[in-house]
């Protein structure tokens, strides 16, 4: 096997991709707080792109809205496969991560507001900061520490974090964004409808188009247009990635040997793991702590910490357990409630959506600095605690697998 093939194969491993993501985040944090921080800010704020299309964006924005959309496409695509062929095909199992996501959105916001009332209402506008889960970082931590965890737990996390993030983005778009371009939003919806029809349509016309035009030439430009329209409408452009992933066809047709869904994942996963996610982490995780002198005494610091570290755990676990007891929904037999507790702690990782929400809601630079510092501290704490819990559960599942293997050979 050639060196490029070995690298590509390695990048299809979640553990390798997760390690690259975490490593890039550490480099960004050190760089942003080093004597060379000015070079980091200069790189992150450098703008490029076609101004005529209103896409003359900073490197940071291209990474957060553009490259991250590729990762969200892969997540949506993987969820589509699970909905059609796998774990989420059973509504009783799909209901639990969705209930966890709804609890993981609502409870952190309520906890934030409760702490805000206790501090006299200061920084109440930041209630949306703890609502979202940093899915890229959460999946990375799970991949690195949970190599022996059951596969359904990863599906649970993907479903939870995707619904969580999309719910948070939509809530913030309605509550905190006044400049939504509904024309661009409508055109994006039309583009998504065309994308879905070309993927899943069964008529002669669409079959002829798919036969005559190479898939990459048909869908890549269309996806770029949909992404640009979603970006122009003022809603987080990564939503376009998730929706297009969910619209992918998961069954081959005609002479196809593999479905478009599996073919797209085969091509894009190494790019996402090796380029998109590390660059996103490098451009997004560099939170400067300069000027955070009042960090410890700031109300928003404790509000964010409480929302992410307490609200997420209570919301995710509190959304899952009652649902399983009061309805026909149930966990996969391979999972235990200790696994879900680890995922609930992992949900306290912010970053992906929390940082943009902090920028939208902060009323001063001091508030923004404190909010970013709190997101960083909460995310690091959640990642370390989840690593301990899930690492222990991974060893537990490894022992169970060994015992089962020994029993099978005797």
Curated annotation (Swiss-Prot):
What catalytic reaction does the record list?
Na(+)(in) + 2 H(+)(out) = Na(+)(out) + 2 H(+)(in)
Give the top-rank taxon of the lineage listed in the UniProt record for this protein: Bacteria
- GO MF annotation list: sodium:proton antiporter activity
Signal peptide range equals none
Q: Where in the cell is it found?
A: Cell membrane
Record key words, sorted? Antiport, Cell membrane, Ion transport, Membrane, Sodium, Sodium transport, Transmembrane, Transmembrane helix, Transport
Q: Which residues cross the membrane?
A: 16-36, 55-75, 95-115, 125-145, 156-176, 178-198, 215-235, 275-295, 299-319, 340-360, 371-391
Question: To which protein family does this belong?
Answer: Belongs to the NhaA Na(+)/H(+) (TC 2.A.33) antiporter family.
Q: Give the protein's function.
A: Na(+)/H(+) antiporter that extrudes sodium in exchange for external protons.
Protein name (database record): Na(+)/H(+) antiporter NhaA 1/4
Give the organism's phylogenetic lineage: Bacteria, Bacillati, Actinomycetota, Actinomycetes, Kitasatosporales
């Amino acid at each position: 096997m050639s060196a490029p093939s070995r690298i590509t194969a390695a990048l299809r491993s979640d553990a390798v991709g997760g390690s690259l993501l975490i490593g890039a985040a550490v480099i960004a944090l050190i760089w942003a707080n080093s004597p060379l921080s000015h070079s980091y800010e200069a790189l992150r704020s450098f703008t490029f792109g076609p101004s005529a299309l209103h896409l003359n964006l900073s490197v940071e924005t291209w990474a957060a809205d553009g490259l991250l959309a590729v990762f969200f496409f892969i997540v949506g695509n993987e969820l589509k496969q699970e909905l059609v062929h796998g774990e989420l095909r059973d509504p009783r199992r799909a209901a639990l991560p969705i209930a966890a996501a709804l609890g993981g959105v609502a409870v952190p916001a309520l906890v934030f507001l409760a702490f805000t009332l206790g501090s006299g209402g200061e920084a109440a506008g930041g209630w949306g900061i703890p609502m979202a889960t940093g899915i890229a970082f959460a999946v990375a931590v799970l991949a690195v520490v949970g190599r022996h965890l059951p596969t359904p737990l990863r599906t649970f996390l993907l479903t939870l974090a995707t619904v969580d993030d999309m719910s948070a983005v939509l809530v913030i778009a309605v509550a905190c964004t006044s400049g939504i371009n509904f024309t661009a939003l409508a055109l994006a919806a039309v583009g998504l409808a065309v994308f879905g029809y070309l993927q899943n349509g069964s008529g002669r016309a669409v079959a002829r188009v798919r036969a005559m035009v190479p898939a990459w030439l048909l869908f890549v430009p269309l996806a770029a247009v949909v992404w640009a329209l979603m970006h122009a409408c003022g809603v987080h452009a990564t939503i376009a990635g998730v929706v297009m992933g969910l619209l992918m066809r998961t069954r081959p047709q005609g002479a196809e040997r593999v479905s478009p869904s599996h073919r797209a994942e085969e091509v894009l996963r190494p790019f996402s793991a090796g380029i998109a996610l590390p660059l996103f982490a490098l451009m997004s995780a560099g939170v400067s702590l300069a000027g955070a002198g009042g960090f410890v005494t700031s109300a928003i610091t404790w509000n964010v910490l409480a929302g992410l570290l307490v609200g997420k755990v209570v919301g995710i676990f509190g959304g899952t357990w009652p649902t399983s007891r009061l309805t026909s929904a149930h966990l996969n037999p391979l999972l235990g409630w200790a696994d879900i507790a680890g995922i609930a702690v992992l949900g306290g990782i912010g970053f992906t959506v929390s940082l943009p929400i902090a920028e939208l809601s902060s009323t001063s630079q001091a508030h923004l600095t404190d909010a970013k510092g709190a997101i960083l501290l909460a995310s690091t704490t959640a990642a370390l605690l989840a690593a301990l819990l899930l690492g222990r559960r991974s060893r537990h599942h490894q022992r169970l697998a060994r015992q089962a293997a020994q029993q099978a050979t005797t």
